Curated annotation (Swiss-Prot):
Keywords: Coiled coil, Cytoplasm
Classification via InterPro entries: LZTFL1 (IPR026157)
Protein's UniProt keywords contain Coiled coil: yes
Keyword Protein transport: no
Cellular location(s): Cytoplasm
Subunit field text: Self-associates. Interacts with BBS9; the interaction mediates the association of LZTL1 with the BBsome complex and regulates BBSome ciliary trafficking.
Gene Ontology molecular function: identical protein binding; protein-containing complex binding
Coiled coil (residue ranges): 96-296
Domain of life of the organism encoding this protein: Eukaryota
One GO BP: negative regulation of protein localization to ciliary membrane
Protein name: Leucine zipper transcription factor-like protein 1
Gene: LZTFL1
Amino acid sequence: MAELGLNEHHQNEVINYMRFARSKRGLRLKTVDSCFQDLKESRLVEETFTVDEVSEVLNGLQAVVHSEVESELINTAYTNVLLLRQLFSQAEKWYLKLQTDISELENRELLEQVAEFEKAEFTSSNKKSIIDSMKPKLAPLHEGGAAELLNKEIIRLQEENEKLKSRLKTIESQATDALDEKSKLERALQDLQLEHGSQKDFIKAQDLSDLENTVAALKSEFQKTLNDQTENQKSLEENLATAKHDLLRVQEQLSMAEKELEKKFQQTAAFRNMKEILTKKNDQIKDLRKRLAKYEPED
């Protein structure tokens, strides 16, 4: 079913709107007919009329018909605005920006094709594909767009997690080196202290001062190494926290998207495919959380 170049669901929505418009149009035409009928019954009771009387009757009829037609045109315009508002509101929920081509509203060929479609839809049970070639058409929106965006976000987080894991290995290596250096410094300090204890009776005051300076320098270097290690550990914790927050945010977006998609497409054939995709993405996120949990710092 592709008479309008739309999928079945959207084409049914168009048919519903055309049915609504036909109903409103029929009511308004009945109102106009009643204006003429009222005129016949209330004013055309004499055998003859003067020119002034005929002019008065026609002017009154013109005013009534003008008011009815104007009211219908205004109401139609407002109705179309409300319809556009519904479409744009739904699009904005998915962060989409729709565009309209006003010039196409006066395309005589397209208008005639729509008229033929209405005629075939409402006057015949045998519908024909008469508008397959109607151009231009809006580019179709992929029903999986939301899931695709979430998938890209998950892939980005996975790549970022790999980078964090690589950085964690580097920091762990640096921490190991720092601990080795610390052990070496402690042993050197102990050796100096032992040497100082065995030779304290023979070392001059200047030599003792030099030794104390050396010990102080070693302590300072050791403290600097510990500070660097602390800063690296803090940076790692911040990165892990950021990744965790991003993961929670994506999981929330995925949950909202799943609920919205279930609501929007639970009557369509695409629902089962979308449900399967969302389930796989949930499994990927659970796996990602387990992998991130391995690198969270212990309290």
